[in-house]
UniProtKB/Swiss-Prot annotation:
It is found in: Cytoplasm. This is Glutamate--tRNA ligase 2. GO terms for molecular function: ATP binding; glutamate-tRNA ligase activity; tRNA binding; zinc ion binding. It holds the Pfam family tRNA-synt_1c. Catalyzes the attachment of glutamate to tRNA(Glu) in a two-step reaction: glutamate is first activated by ATP to form Glu-AMP and then transferred to the acceptor end of tRNA(Glu). PANTHER family: GLUTAMATE--TRNA LIGASE (PTHR43311), GLUTAMATE--TRNA LIGASE, MITOCHONDRIAL-RELATED (PTHR43311:SF2). Its EC number is 6.1.1.17. GO terms for cellular component: cytosol. A motif ('KMSKS' region) lies at residues 238-242. One of its GO terms (biological process) is glutamyl-tRNA aminoacylation. The gene is gltX2.
């Protein structure tokens, strides 16, 4: 059997972080078993569905590296097929037309409320003769659900979950305007697409009982199910806007790498021993549905930052440059020159061990391209005492005559200078850092000087000596 999974988002907004995890789990399970991962856009709510939201979902999946098989399928475009199945159930006697008016149904609910009964359709048209239908009323089509026994969901995550059929009413399959309901459309689409495993949030678990009844009415074999607990915020409450970023696009804008997000989302609800760093290839080999936890997982932004720092350190320097250049250019308000690209690439080994996001990386390297004289932050300016400026003057002379302009040679020269003058290395290096970067925090300062080059280094030292 070929494993077929699907991701079926509604295009009413961005790709939610919870949806991204659902897509990842489906993708991993399919790829790990040599199967197919399909994408279906559940766009039957025409009032809320937008092309911009579809584009955002596709873009988010593409950025995460979750490629799908074939073209995305529009649920709305399959409405005729959904109606065909509803009418087939009518012919089989597994469904019926209901002519109850909205006023009748509201009165029914009010009476149930008054008696303290569960509010559900009472089956008033289930066995009535269609000849009794009132004139001029467009009926809905309802499933003739079993009234005895139970419906059982056998779930890879939740275990065996049962409901008494007497607790379920006859759901609407086709509305009076001929449009299908969500529950019908999902079943028909999953069946026609050959979906073998449905992996989705556990907020869909109650829908599954009704969907299984549709499968049974049509004589179709249902897929296997895995209902995954939702993601909660750090405080344990259901994830909401107050917890921060909700969309995948926001995490990208905050400077997280796609491989970080894949690893992090994988560990939200699934584990492989104590492993925290799990490559995508390892995830494909190890991931299985039965090891998904049954408790909600919590976002942990500190863990996400640390994980991102790991993947930044592991990344190729040229790739990091390509990712960070647009951010740098936006901050500078101009494009980088070819020589500035080269400078950034040369500086990358010193920068990447010190940051946890691409945003930090972009902000941290701006001093490489700053116009002279550099703007100094308060701590850096405080270091430039008259004594420090005198030291910088001596370093200027020392560096001017240095034959080998490398980080190692610069460091040795400054160490020798500190020893001669009886100063600690930090007493010399920190004012130099302030002069070259405008800050008290930077990559190793001798690497910075090497990347800046002799001319730029000497000019920045000169500016710092003259600073008012």
């Amino acid at each position: 059997m070929t494993i077929v999974t699907r991701f079926a988002p509604s295009p009413t907004g961005f790709l939610h972080i919870g949806g991204a995890r659902t897509a990842l789990f489906n993708w991993l399970y399919a790829r790990g078993h040599g199967g197919k991962f399909l994408l279906r856009i559940e766009d039957t709510d025409r009032a809320r569905s937008t092309q911009a939201a579809v584009d955002a979902i596709l873009d988010g999946l593409d950025w995460l590296g979750l490629e799908w098989d074939g073209d995305p399928i529009s649920q709305f475009e399959r409405k005729d097929r959904h109606a065909e199945v509803a009418h087939e159930m009518l012919r089989r006697g597994m469904a019926y037309r209901c002519y109850a008016s909205p006023e009748e149904l509201e009165a029914m609910k009010e009476e149930q409320r008054r008696q303290g009964l569960p509010m559900r359709y009472d089956g008033r048209w289930r066995d009535r003769d269609p000849s009794e239908a009132p004139a001029g009323v467009n009926p809905v089509i309802r499933l003739k659900a079993p009234q005895e026994g139970e419906t059982v969901v056998r779930d890879h995550v939740q275990g065996e979950v049962r409901v008494q059929n007497a607790q379920l009413d006859d759901m609407i399959l086709l509305r009076s305007d001929g449009t299908p309901t969500y529950l019908l459309a999902v079943v028909v689409d999953d069946y026609d697409m050959g979906v073998t495993h449905v992996v989705r949030g556990d907020d869909h678990l109650t829908n599954t009982f009704r969907q299984l009844q549709i499968y049974a009415a049509m004589g179709w074999t249902p897929p296997e199910y895995a209902h995954v607990p939702l993601i909660h915020g750090p405080d344990g409450a259901k994830l909401s806007k107050r917890h921060g970023a909700l969309g995948v696009d926001a995490y990208r804008d905050m400077g997280y790498l796609p491989e970080t997000m894949r690893n992090y989302l994988l560990r939200l609800g699934w584990s492989h021993g104590d492993d925290e760093i799990i490559s995508t290839d390892q995830a494909k080999a190890w991931f299985n549905l039965d090891d998904i936890g049954r408790s909600p997982s919590r976002l942990d932004f500190a863990k996400l930052d640390n994980l991102n720092g790991h993947y930044i350190r592991q990344s190729d320097d040229a790739r990091l440059v390509s990712l960070v250049v647009p951010m740098v250019e936006k901050r500078l308000g101009r494009p980088l020159t070819g020589s500035e690209h080269a400078r950034l690439l040369a500086a990358m080994p010193g920068f990447k061990p010190r940051v946890k996001t691409l945003v930090e990386l972009a902000d941290g390297c701006l001093f490489l391209f700053a116009l002279r004289p550099l703007a100094m932050d308060d701590k850096a300016a405080a270091l430039l005492t008259p004594e420090a400026k005198a030291q910088l003057g001596e370093l200027h002379a020392l560096f001017s005559g240095l034959g080998d302009w490398t980080g190692g040679a610069l460091e040795q020269a400054v160490r020798d200078f500190a020893e001669r003058t009886g100063l600690k290395l930090g007493k010399v290096a920190q004012p130099l850092r302030a002069a070259l970067t405008g800050s008290t925090v930077s990559p190793p300062i001798f690497e910075v000087a090497e990347v800046l080059g002799r001319t730029e280094t000497l000019e920045r030292i000169d500016d710092a000596r003259k600073a008012g």
